[in-house]
């Protein structure tokens, strides 16, 4: 399912127009992004948790030249599915 299909599905299930469903989805995504930028967790009970984790600096290797390169530390977004969501998917 792509973004357009998700918007259509949201509109049908919520009796919103596609435009309103698109605005709602954009607002949700922006709110999650803003919270993660501040280092906050976003917990949606029954669905899952969005959070950030620190990935340590490490050495990597250029596959073409075999040269060792340093990969800097970075912060990455992570989603952990909740139990109800996992159970529904594994039905």
Curated annotation (Swiss-Prot):
InterPro entries noted in UniProt: Hist_DNA-bd, Histone-like_DNA-bd_CS, IHF-like_DNA-bd_dom_sf
Residue intervals passing through the bilayer: none
Entry annotated with the keyword NADP: no
CDD domains in the record: HU
GO terms assigned for molecular function: DNA binding; structural constituent of chromatin
One biological process term in Gene Ontology: chromosome condensation
Keywords on record: DNA condensation, DNA-binding
The organism's place on the tree of life at top rank: Bacteria
Family: Belongs to the bacterial histone-like protein family.
Known role: Histone-like DNA-binding protein which is capable of wrapping DNA to stabilize it, and thus to prevent its denaturation under extreme environmental conditions.
Name of the protein in question: DNA-binding protein HU
């Amino acid at each position: 399912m792509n973004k357009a299909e998700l918007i259509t599905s949201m509109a049908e299930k919520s009796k919103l127009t596609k435009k309103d469903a698109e605005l709602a989805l954009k607002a949700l995504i922006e709110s999650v992004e803003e919270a993660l930028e501040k280092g906050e967790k976003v917990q949606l009970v029954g669905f899952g948790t969005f959070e950030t984790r620190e990935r340590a600096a490490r050495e990597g290797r250029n596959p073409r030249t075999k040269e060792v390169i340093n990969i800097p530390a970075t912060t990455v977004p992570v989603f952990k599915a909740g139990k109800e969501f996992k159970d529904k998917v594994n039905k």
